[in-house]
Design a protein with these regions (language model features):
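C-terminal accessory "lid"/substrate-recognition subdomains
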Residues: 3, 160-237
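Alpha-helical scaffold elements adjacent to nucleotide-binding pockets in ATP/GTP-utilizing enzyme cores
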Residues: 81-84, 106-110, 145-148, 167-174, ...
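Active-site glycine-rich loop that binds ribose-phosphate moieties when present
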Residues: 137-142, 155, 166-168
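Short, hinge-like loop/turn segments at secondary-structure boundaries
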Residues: 56-59, 112-114, 140-142, 198-202
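Nucleotide-state-sensitive switch-loop elements of NTP-binding domains
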Residues: 5-14, 19-135
Length: 237
């Protein structure tokens, strides 16, 4: 629970259509947020939202925005909606699940101006099976979601081979040199571990720890690079 004048923390979980945002949020609600004062703001712009019964059982309040994409046509209304949520519920956390065809950069532009909110994390979920084709066919939205994110969480990595995974990482790194990239299958991770990574921790993630070690020399390479300081490296995910 919040203390005194502590601000409401806000977590944005973006991702293209069908990437797995809803599945991830369900996992976080079940394992991390259950029993806490949380508001989920979701935009059902052509997508199936989280089941209301599931949220009720978890004690989560849902504030749905169904009149259009929150990061495009409803920027003004969305800001007002967030202010109303803070005023009415005074939650510990607000989780925003935007439309899959929205730009994360636009959402951040709205959120940073809302009084009483502290931006806690802004992450993008990417389907490991579809990363390459979405990068080719939906560049404006897909690339913005990746380039803006502080953490990129790959879904369905257990369903792709190592070659495909490395291609995905290369695409992400081309667009975003600094984001943390989670490649571990979600079933092998706790919700708390994912939250920690979204907030900046690398503990317990071999892929993040390896990349951090690789880059500490200042060479600028990442775990998709073959050579670091003249040495060939193999990385496991």
């Amino acid at each position: 629970m919040k203390e005194g004048n502590e601000m409401t923390k806000i977590d944005i979980i973006s991702g293209f259509l069908g990437a797995g945002k809803t599945t991830l949020i369900q996992k976080l609600i079940k394992e991390v947020y259950a029993g806490k004062k949380v508001v989920l703001v979701e935009n059902e712009f052509g997508e199936i939202g989280i089941d209301g019964g599931f949220l009720k059982d978890s004690g989560i309040v849902v504030n749905e925005i169904n009149s259009g994409c929150i990061c495009c046509t409803l920027q003004g209304d969305f800001r007002n909606a967030l202010q109303e949520v803070v005023k009415k519920y005074d939650p510990d956390h607000i989780i925003i699940e935007p439309s899959g065809v929205g730009k994360l950069s636009d959402i951040l532009a709205v959120v940073k101006d809302v009084e009483g909110l502290q931006l806690n994390s802004y992450s993008t979920v990417v389907d490991a099976k579809r990363c390459e084709i979405y990068h080719k066919n939906f560049k404006e939205f897909f690339d913005d979601q990746i380039s803006t994110a502080a953490c990129v969480i790959l879904s369905r990595t257990q369903l792709v081979d190592e070659e495909t995974l490395q291609k995905d990482i290369a695409i992400i790194r081309e667009l975003n040199h600094d984001a943390r990239i989670i490649t571990t299958p979600w079933d092998d991770l706790s919700g708390q571990a994912i939250i920690d990574a979204m907030e900046g921790s690398t503990d317990g993630f071999p892929e993040l720890e390896e990349e951090e070690e690789c880059c500490c020399c200042g060479c600028g390479c990442h775990d998709d690079d073959d050579d670091c300081c003249g040495e060939h490296n193999h990385h496991e995910h």
